[in-house]
């Protein structure tokens, strides 16, 4: 099988890293050889696979060694559950430098050291998603990842972020093979959430590849720094992640998305009761003015 490179984007706090590690565990359980490249300064993209608080990052190790040229691949590449290879790009100290730069440095280092030449079926990039700056767009921009999955929920800001990421994909699709492969709904138990994300997916010209229900077993597994598939393999939630990984394995639906305008997105949110229609008459009115108008 030819190497498939997939990037997972999504708003911060949406459960992107948890979802990525659980679906990758499902793919590994089915016999696939996988590498995860964490592209988030928090360096939490591999903790459930390695049972670790946080993996040493390429940027940290390079700083200790003197430069990235002084590193060996085995210094930064660790194997975890199911033989999954794990790398974290890391970033600079808060307030110093560009975190996106760490992603660029890490991917270049992995290429030069032959990490992609190993017998791999999939590479997954777990990418910080509401910052669509050059560094974080690296997996898209340099044609590293061809399949982009966006983790989303029925919350307004998660949908705004998904639409912005779709705009980024359009920008780079014309010069390469990058395509939107689907939305993964990580449920927040919002009313009509599955319908809303199906509608958003249709508007973007893609699919909701899977609806992952909310289940407390995810948190119980996380406390133990494990994926659900490893912690409780017979649970319903483990089967949900297996279903998601199987859908990704068989996915052939790769599109150049059709992002929504802000008005279209707000219309969609209003249609599903996520947002009230704007009342232009109250814009700019203070509480005192509103009270005076109400008693007039």
Swiss-Prot record:
Among the Pfam families in the record, one is: Fer4_NifH
Q: Does the keyword Metal-binding apply?
A: yes
Cofactor note text: Binds 1 [4Fe-4S] cluster per dimer.
Enumerate the residues binding [4Fe-4S] cluster. 98, 133
Q: Which domain of life is it from?
A: Bacteria
Q: Which cysteines are joined by disulfide bonds?
A: none
Enumerate the Gene Ontology biological process terms: nitrogen fixation
Which cofactors does this gene product need? [4Fe-4S] cluster
Entry's Gene3D superfamilies? P-loop containing nucleotide triphosphate hydrolases
The protein's job, in short, is: The key enzymatic reactions in nitrogen fixation are catalyzed by the nitrogenase complex, which has 2 components: the iron protein and the molybdenum-iron protein.
- For this entry, the protein name equals Nitrogenase iron protein
Species source reads: Magnetococcus marinus (strain ATCC BAA-1437 / JCM 17883 / MC-1)
